[in-house]
Structure formats: C-alpha cells, structure tokens
C-alpha cells in the first residue's frame, strides 16, 4: 500500500533525511521508533506532502501510484491521512462541523461513520475539548 524508495528530504535548505526506504503492505501494522531528533516527524510530514518538507530525491508510492509531487490535499483525496500524538483542541468548532467539512469532498454519511466508530456521543462537543485519549483517536479516525 505504501512504498518509499530512496527518499531524501530537505527542511529550509538542509538535508535532514538521506536515502530512506520503506514498504508497508496492506493489512500490516508498523511502528516508527527512534530517539528525539532522528527524523521520524520529518519522514511522516514528507510522506504526507507538507510543503516545508521538500523531497529532493526518491519516490513515494501509495496504492501503486507515485504521489511524490502531489500536494497534501491530493494525497488526502487518495486516502492518505495522519493521526497526531497530541491532537489540538479547537474551541468553538464542534467535531460534527469539522467532520462535515471534511466529508464535503466525498459524499459520506457522517452519522453512519460516527456510529461505526462509536463516537456519535461527542460529535456535538468542541473538537478534542475534554476528550479522553481514546475519544481523540476515534475523532481523528472519523475525520480521516
């Protein structure tokens, strides 16, 4: 599903990742571990297409398609997503509002997805405000 080949990444003109390769087949779960400052976040942000993280060499393939030079929103449309370790609280924005905004790209039933992930009880609360760790993760899954 995800293959990274010989990736080199620069941040603000400095090469921070050199010749990184990875293969994550469908149905497998992997963990990316390393000490602080080893490039884990840089690697993930580059894979997702955040502009600050410039891929200078290598390829990123998602479901067999080369997405290396696609913008973040196009990668998201193809099904790529990211869950944060500590997602931000967004006061004044209900989880339902955020999910419905994301759902406009595709025709999806927000309530059906919320039921499937057992999170319909917090759709009308501010995003991540007072959420338990598990609620935050389920909220992120609904948003993806």
Regions from the PLM with identified roles:
Residues 2-4, 16-17:
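Conserved structural motif at the start of ABC-family nucleotide-binding domains
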Residues 14-17, 74:
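Short coil-to-beta microelement around the adenine-binding A-loop and adjacent beta1/P-loop entry
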Residues 33-35:
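The feature captures the beta-strand-to-loop junction immediately N-terminal to the Walker
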Residues 48:
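Helix-to-loop junction immediately C-terminal to a conserved catalytic motif
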Residues 54-55, 66-81:
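ABC ATPase NBD coupling module
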Residues 86, 92-109:
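Q-loop/switch helix immediately C-terminal to the Walker
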Residues 108-126:
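Conserved ABC ATPase "signature" region
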């Amino acid at each position: 599903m995800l293959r990274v080949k010989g990736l080199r990444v620069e941040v603000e003109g400095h090469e921070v990742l050199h010749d990184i390769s990875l293969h994550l087949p469908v149905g497998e779960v992997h963990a990316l571990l390393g000490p602080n400052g080893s490039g884990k976040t840089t690697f993930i942000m580059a894979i997702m297409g955040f502009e600050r993280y410039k891929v200078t060499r290598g390829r990123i393939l998602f479901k067999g398609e080369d997405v290396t030079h696609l913008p973040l929103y196009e990668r998201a449309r193809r099904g790529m997503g990211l869950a944060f370790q500590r997602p931000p609280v967004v006061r004044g924005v209900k989880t339902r509002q955020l999910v419905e905004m994301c759902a406009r790209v595709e025709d999806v039933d927000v309530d059906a997805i919320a039921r499937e992930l057992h999170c319909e009880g917090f759709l009308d609360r501010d995003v991540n405000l007072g959420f338990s760790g598990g609620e935050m993760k389920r909220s992120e899954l609904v948003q993806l």
